Amino acid sequence: MSRLLTDFPMKKKRSDDARHIEGWQSKNERIESLLNVLYDFRFNTVKSRTEYRAASSSGLYQPVTKFVLNSFRRRLDATAGIVTSAENIRTILESDFARKVHPIREYFNALPLLNPTEHGHIGRLLNTVQVANPGKWEEYFTKWLIGVVANAMNDTGCQNHTCLVLTGDRQGQFKSWWLDNLCPTPLKNYLFTGKIDPQGKDILTLIAEYLFINIDDQLKELNKQNENALKNLITTPAVKYRRPYDVYIEEYPTLPASWLR
């Protein structure tokens, strides 16, 4: 006598709690466990990518590139016999497996609190530049510097509408060098120096990912259309675009303090 399939009770799926009590791990859980032993990971919300460094080290975080993903895949196979794809590893790393970090805010929050009137660091910095009007130089540089930090620490609105401009009669006066060195060493990955296209597609990535943009010797070359586009970029609070290899268009707050000379 034949029996219907419904006559056989379905085997119940074990709960996640039961699986962990029994010490059972999925393949991806084994991958995550081993990666955590070997490396430290974080998701850089400014660059919108995962970064890594050797576990328990104090070295700088490096971006997870295609080469690095393939190296992870190779090491998982050699160390634990885990065979997986680089794409699967990338999917794991671009999830809540890696903690989200805003490196620029992390840097500023870790700085010691100083009394500006007592220490006078801004004044000593200003004295390294010879200008025609020291009073205005101090006023606007201080306003610009405060705006740099305010813009980096807030996602909403644009807190810095001041653009720092250094001009000189001749080349070789170290204007670009001075501006570049305003960027702290730990934040050098967020400094761009060079020429930009105010109406090009790449500019959206620049103002979303870089805190400092040093536009080298470009002010006099801008036509009226590019000049207006640049003014708009400086005061834009956020940009919407699709990053390379992303699926969706997303909104990103703008970061940079643009410098021209």
What function would you assign to each model-found segment?
Residues F41-K47, K188-Y190, P237-R243:
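Short secondary-structure junctions
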